[in-house]
Amino acid sequence: MAKQKIRIRLKAYEHRILDQSADKIVETAKRTGATISGPIPLPTERTLYTVIRSPHKYKDSREQFEMRTHKRLIDIVNPTPKTVDSLMKLDLPSGVDIEIKL
């Protein structure tokens, strides 16, 4: 029988909230008896926006804004039914995007 694996990808703009969420997931999975690999930090995605400061002219005067998206990857190997139930009931902050693949 093939091993089951749950892959969880977390994305957030704030790395502190992201790390807290990853710690909650890892602690919950370990408490229920699953094997964990991670959290693995993935490359930070950086989006840069350049805008002209004035509304009409002075094109040489520009301002740059950036948005950083931090990512983490957690693999849960051989999850028990108890692990899946406890992960479904877990409350995480609203600024974290979660992608789960079975």
UniProtKB/Swiss-Prot annotation:
SUPFAM superfamilies: Ribosomal protein S10. InterPro entries: Ribosomal_uS10, Ribosomal_uS10_CS, Ribosomal_uS10_dom, Ribosomal_uS10_dom_sf. Transmembrane segments: none annotated. One of its GO terms (cellular component) is ribonucleoprotein complex. Keywords: Ribonucleoprotein, Ribosomal protein. GO terms for molecular function: structural constituent of ribosome; tRNA binding. Gene3D superfamilies: Ribosomal protein S10 domain (3.30.70.600). The keyword Ribosomal protein applies. This is Small ribosomal subunit protein uS10. The gene is rpsJ.
